[in-house]
Amino acid sequence: MNNQKQQKPTLSGQRFKTRKRDEKERFDPTQFQDCIIQGLNETGNDLEAVAKFLDASGAKLDYRRYAETLFDILVAGGMLAPGGTLADEVIRTDVCVFSAQEDLETMQAFAQVFNKLIRRYKYLEKGFEEEVKKLLLFLKGFSESERNKLAMLTGILLANGNLSASILNSLYNENLVKEGVSAAFAVKLFKSWINEKDINAVAGSLRKVNMDNRLMELFPANKQTVEHFTKYFTDAGLKELAEYVRNQQTIGARKELQKELQEMMSRGEPLKEISMYVKDEMKKNNISEQTVIGILWSSVMSCVEWNKKEELVTEQAIKHLKQYSPLLAAFTTQGQSELTLLLKIQEYCYDNIHFMKSFQKIVVLFYKAEVLSEEPILKWYKDAHLAKGKSVFLEQMKKFVEWLKNAEEESESETEEGD
């Protein structure tokens, strides 16, 4: 048996050739720019030819290294200096976004050029996003027409999914906001975005990157109100965006109201103070009584640890709700609010199985405490109830509803006798 270790082959002296398809011509940025500009100029503004040229050039030129230069040229016609002006003594091309016609159709055609390029060379995605973030910070260095074209193009690319809505962060730059550049740019951007998709798709993209609650920041701090935002964007023809932001603010205000209510209740603050706070919030954020009664109900029900035994939970619930009846009564001044509360009670008792037998007792308590009145209860019983557990709850309410109807008839006959 041979105990000698076999010598492993070494690679010294070996030279490996790069496969021809992996070779890239090594240029400095200026040489790279010259090659791209020369090729673009030869296309004669034919964007189909531009897309083909860019596709073919990626095999020879180092797009990965010079992505910024490539995108500068395609947008502005040449390499950009800090601030957004074209670098001194550079050659430039008119086959670019900034030299194109200022209309949606042309920008859609340019968007296709970027789309094809990025789909062909996936590694350019990140570089392109960084480029757009940079261009947005340079907005003050561009003319109004150049900004408009960039805004339209960006909106289309956002709609196509070539860009993430996180690029909008650049628009919150203090100087751009202060001078009104951000808001004006956003108008053009959102118009083209909504034109390609719709407000629901836009909202989804904004939500994905937690940008849905930040649109107010397009304005200086002293103008960050729903009223100002709504007027500005409605006047600019973007009513759907204005309504979306108004709804977002209302949703935010509701969440804040619920959170504060739960804290006030857990601290045991007087009902009078809670009522005053709620009324102020309703006025300030334009929240309806129907919405408020729903928030109050869920806050009241979530501020206590419920007994798990069905036979004990009803007694506990009645005691707890009796305490909060005056507060609830203050926000059921309309029949629709009473009906909303009835539906919330039904839903709660169905979703929390220990409360299935408590429904009728809660309704009777609220009737006696003048939180609920006859008409909404009868309407709920007749045709306004939910499907959830309806057979159980209607059966529970049968006798009480009959009593209400009899009481109503007696009251009517007494009135007639009096007449």
Curated annotation (Swiss-Prot):
Translation initiation regulator which may repress repeat-associated non-AUG (RAN) initiated translation probably by acting as a competitive inhibitor of eukaryotic translation initiation factor 5 (EIF5) function. Enhances histone H4 gene transcription but does not seem to bind DNA directly. The keyword Transcription regulation applies. Coiled coil: none annotated. Residues 247-414 form the W2 domain. This is eIF5-mimic protein 2. Belongs to the BZW family. Residues 1-15 have a biased composition (Polar residues). GO terms for biological process: regulation of translational initiation. Residues 1-26 are annotated as: Disordered. Keywords: Activator, Transcription, Transcription regulation, Translation regulation. It holds the Pfam family HEAT_5MP1_2. It comes from the Eukaryota.
